Curated annotation (Swiss-Prot):
The keyword Hydrolase applies. The gene is FAN1. It comes from the Eukaryota. This is Fanconi-associated nuclease 1 homolog. Its main location: nucleus. PANTHER family: FANCONI-ASSOCIATED NUCLEASE 1. Keywords: DNA damage, DNA repair, Hydrolase, Magnesium, Manganese, Metal-binding, Nuclease, Nucleus. SMART domains: HIRAN, VRR_NUC. It comes from Arabidopsis thaliana (Mouse-ear cress). Mn(2+) 1 binds at D833, E852, V853.
């Protein structure tokens, strides 16, 4: 895989089915900054026309077809996407009011031709991609209209609230009547819910319970303030097992009792919480499925906090979703979370959707879905997509009708044969035949796809999380830490910046797809687009460092860096050099500058320019953003290149770089010694093992009786997370934007340490003074299982973590944590493979050693070397363990 592609995949997340700007990005003219004349140094010397040739290779040009023949992309593995089924969760929010009537027509303009991006919603040129929906006053079903009643205050009898009776399976009475009297009774003996509240009939018969969310808020008030509730049944469902709508009133305990209750400090906020929960529940009654509730909460949260990023028409369209019927909402969410893009109605069946056909019709009318049932509605693209819905048997049957016979059982080959028939005008109308097989087909409309994708992106702020995150939370598979979301500045201050960011992610996805499809023309096009977007852009210095990753220039820089790897893989180093210089000139304060500088120096050397390579390396050491492994790499390059007559003076850092790291060599019986394959050995017990396990066996035996584990960076990031837990999740404005974060947004920036310097240093002083183990135990026991960046709960026991902290020592642990706090991004990887320790006879004091294990043909990376040198300087006991295969003895 090309360097930088894995990072790009994480940025993209789940691929979008519809890219609004795909055609415009690939067809519009883009200033070709790579269509330039280079000299032997890889420097731009003059503008060139379309026939420009690179000095490195006179046969190459910027026409992708000129160099596509020698691309070696066939070894790239295609990414597989997995689909998560939504289940349940609980996530509350107060929704916006719905607008009654609207008409929406949408279109997105190109943002290629100007610096200012103005997207408006107007009629699309393709009828199938346009939406026109009208929300009538009576669009809500009767049951939903009834559930949208507001909470009122009855001045004579007290506070009236509307809610439901649930848990009807526990009822003593099956048949209920509208107007029947009811009373509320606490049920603290309920072993499943100590806050349970029973609903009792006028004859003292059990009717069910109040919903759990309301009981949780209301039960403390009943217990502490002796509140009494009675009311009536206001609606009876068709099925006796369904929830029953009721209205209950809290009577005054005496003539002035209500005001007396309000005098207590805790009463008012608790009662307001009850009203909030009641209001939310009436918006989403018990019959609302969990994934349906989560989806609506997603919409409401984003529309509440990011309304300035949507046009009036877009907001109206999204706000119309809750007015859809229950079936329509459920069907849309189900289909949106599936791969698609097209679905056969005959294959759509969900137990919670009673009428899929009617739901689909409603969704199509309202613009959330597009459907096709007439062959005249199919163009070539839709035709290709719908053929994917046919199975192998259906494909063979259709081909046989055209007297095309194929022995292959591969679906892709059959589809290609079918499409070739469709392109041949002499054949029968395949569109009609295919639709006869598939029946009515539907897909999520492009407008809904684009807007819901934006909502998810704004809610989760990444491409790796989606609606399935609610499922993980509800099932207890993941537990998020407790923190406060303190608003400061907006991540996207205006719509223009958001649209530029979205377009950059589109370019990134196009780049990824083109690499999968071995399409060099599109690869080059994406590189050019991304390079053009950063040519006149740089990260806003006033923008918080934690928010830089949400800018278009930052995303485009990821595409450009992948382009560097692409050109390096093709040995077109002058193009890679040009792109690296563009990155270095546009991003002056970026932790990636170190890697870019190393690549620039290396590529210049590949071009036969050692003097310039040396100069770049020397200038890189003056850059404060060149750190950790990149800094060591440049120092080692300088020592290698700065030989007389290029340089006569020995660099001052030569002694530091050449600092001797202790080594030990052991032998093992090798199972394989092939280059490029991870070495396997026979362990002391005769079982196969890796090189790290073999080293652990050595240290536990003749190496000195050490205990140990194979940890790499994981144990140190875990210790850092536990020791700094309260600081990581402290109240800092702006760093927590969503409820699904495992770390503050600024963790990998300089601002993390600078903003919290006083508290960090205070905590590190405690660690250095011997309190590390105590802090570790408290964090481990109180936060166990809670997700936190870097903390690997499943890998290490508390005993192993305590041993590591106790044997390494407080001073060393504090030094390591300080480096991670100051520059987490640079130091979060590359730590030694093994941690070994042994206690002294008293059982409390001990010693530890960090070991980097290398096989015979393996060598240290620059990041690993940087860590070993840093650890030695901080007082750690470190060692390199080299494993060599033992000589084979013939018997």
């Amino acid at each position: 895989m090309l360097t930088g592609r894995e990072s790009l995949l994480r940025l993209i997340g789940k691929r979008r089915r519809f890219l609004p700007n795909r055609h415009l990005l690939l067809s519009a003219h883009t200033p070709n900054s790579l269509n330039l004349e280079f000299n032997d140094y890889g420097n731009l010397v003059s503008l060139a026309g379309d026939d420009c040739r690179l000095s490195e290779d006179p046969t190459s040009s910027d026409d992708p077809s000129k160099f596509s023949d020698d691309l070696s992309l066939s070894t790239r593995k295609k990414r597989r996407l997995t689909q998560t089924t939504l289940l349940q969760s609980s996530f509350l929010s107060v929704p916006k009011q719905l607008e009654d009537g609207l008409v929406i027509c949408t279109q997105q303009k190109s943002i290629l031709d100007s610096e200012t991006f103005e997207f408006s919603l107007v009629q699309r040129s393709e009828p199938s991609e346009s939406i026109c929906c009208k929300v009538e006053d009576g669009s809500c079903s009767p049951s939903r209209e009834e559930s949208l009643k507001t909470v009122t205050l009855d001045e004579d009898n007290g506070e009236a609230i509307e809610t439901f009776i649930v848990g009807r399976k526990f009822s003593d009475v099956q048949d209920l009547e509208i107007g029947g009297d009811i009373f509320l009774l606490r049920h603290p003996e309920n072993v499943k819910d100590r806050n349970a509240i029973k609903v009792i009939s006028g004859d003292s018969e059990m009717l069910g319970y109040l919903p759990k969310d309301i009981s949780q808020c209301l039960s403390p008030l009943i217990d502490d303030y002796d509140l009494k509730f009675e009311g009536t049944i206001t609606s009876v469902p068709k099925k006796s097992s369904e929830a029953v709508l009721i209205k209950v009133v809290c009577h005054k305990m005496r003539s002035d009792g209500w005001k007396e209750c309000e005098l207590y400090g805790d009463f008012k906020p608790l009662w307001e919480k009850v009203l909030q929960v009641v209001e939310h529940q009436m918006q989403f009654p018990p019959k609302t499925t969990r994934y349906q509730l989560n989806f609506n909460v997603l919409l409401q949260e984003v529309l509440r906090s990011c309304s300035h990023l949507f046009t009036a028409d877009e907001k109206a369209f999204l706000e119309s979703f809750p007015t859809l019927s229950e079936d329509s909402q459920r069907l849309f969410i189900r289909l949106y979370t599936r791969k698609g893009p097209w679905f056969r109605l005959s294959n759509i069946s969900y137990p919670e959707v009673t009428d899929s056909l009617q739901a689909l019709k409603d969704l199509t009318v309202r613009g959330f879905m597009s459907s096709v049932k007439d062959a005249n509605e199919l163009d070539n693209q839709k035709m290709k997509e719908i053929t994917e819905l046919l199975n192998v048997t259906e494909l063979r049957d259709i081909l046989s009708m055209n007297k095309v016979f194929s022995r292959t059982s591969r679906k892709r080959d059959l589809i290609n044969s079918l499409c070739s028939c469709y392109n041949d005008g002499t054949r029968i109308n395949l569109a009609t035949v295919i639709l006869e097989r598939t029946g009515l087909c539907a897909k999520v409309s492009s407008t809904a796809e684009s807007l819901i994708w934006r909502v998810e992106r704004l809610f989760f702020l990444n491409g790796e999380q989606d609606l399935s995150s609610f499922v993980l939370l509800d099932l207890g598979i993941i537990k998020y830490p407790t923190y406060k979301c303190i608003d400061s500045e907006q991540i996207f201050s205006n719509r223009t910046k958001l649209l530029a960011y979205e377009e950059a992610i589109e370019v990134a996805q196009l780049m990824d797809e083109s690499l999968d499809n071995e399409d060099p023309q599109t690869v080059l096009k994406c590189i050019i687009i991304a390079e053009t977007r950063i040519s006149s852009s740089s990260l806003d210095s006033a923008h918080a460092a934690a928010f830089n990753r949400f800018t278009a220039p930052w995303v485009n820089s990821k595409v450009v860096l992948l382009g560097v790897s692409f050109f390096e893989n093709q040995k077109r180093y002058n193009r890679a050099v040009y792109l690296l210089r563009r990155l270095l000139s546009c991003f002056n304060c970026d932790g990636r500058r170190g890697y870019w500088t190393v690549r620039l120096s290396t590529d210049l050397e590949h071009m036969g320019r050692p003097n310039e390579s040396l100069t770049v390396a020397e200038q890189g050491l003056l850059d404060p953003w060149v750190r950790a492994g990149s800094r060591v790499a440049l120092q080692r390059r300088i020592l290698r290149l700065a030989k007389p007559p290029r340089r006569w003076k020995t660099p001052t850092f030569s002694n530091l770089v050449d600092n001797k790291i202790p080594e030990v060599t052991i032998q093992g019986r090798s199972l394989n010694c092939e280059v490029g394959i991870k070495n396997r050995f026979y362990g002391e017990d005769g079982e196969q093992c890796g090189v790290e396990q073999l080293a652990l066996q050595y240290y536990s035996g003749e190496g000195g009786g050490w205990q140990g584990i194979h940890t790499e960076s994981s144990i140190w990031l875990t210790i850092f997370g536990l020791l700094m837990w309260d600081i990581l999740f402290s109240d800092v404005p702006g760093v927590f934007q969503t409820r699904f974060q495992t770390a503050p947004l600024d963790l990998e920036t300089e601002s993390f340490y600078l903003t919290r310097k006083e508290t960090i240093e205070s905590q590190l002083e405690k660690v250095a003074n011997g309190m590390a183990e105590e802090i570790l135990i408290i964090s481990y026991e109180t936060q166990r299982g809670t997700a936190c960046r870097g903390v690997a709960w499943e890998r290490f026991s508390l005993e192993e973590l305590r041993a590591a902290v106790a044997c390494v020592g407080g001073m060393c642990i504090a030094s390591l944590c300080r480096h991670l706090a100051q520059d987490y991004r640079s130091w979060c990887s590359g730590m030694p493979d093994l941690l070994v320790w042994r206690f002294k006879e008293n059982g409390y004091e001990g010693e530890a050693k960090l070991v980097e294990v290398k096989s015979e043909k393996d060598r240290l990376s620059e990041q690993q070397r940087a860590w070993l040198l840093l650890l030695m300087d901080s007082g750690f006991n470190v060692e390199i363990c080299k494993v060599r295969p033992a000589s084979l003895i013939k018997t």
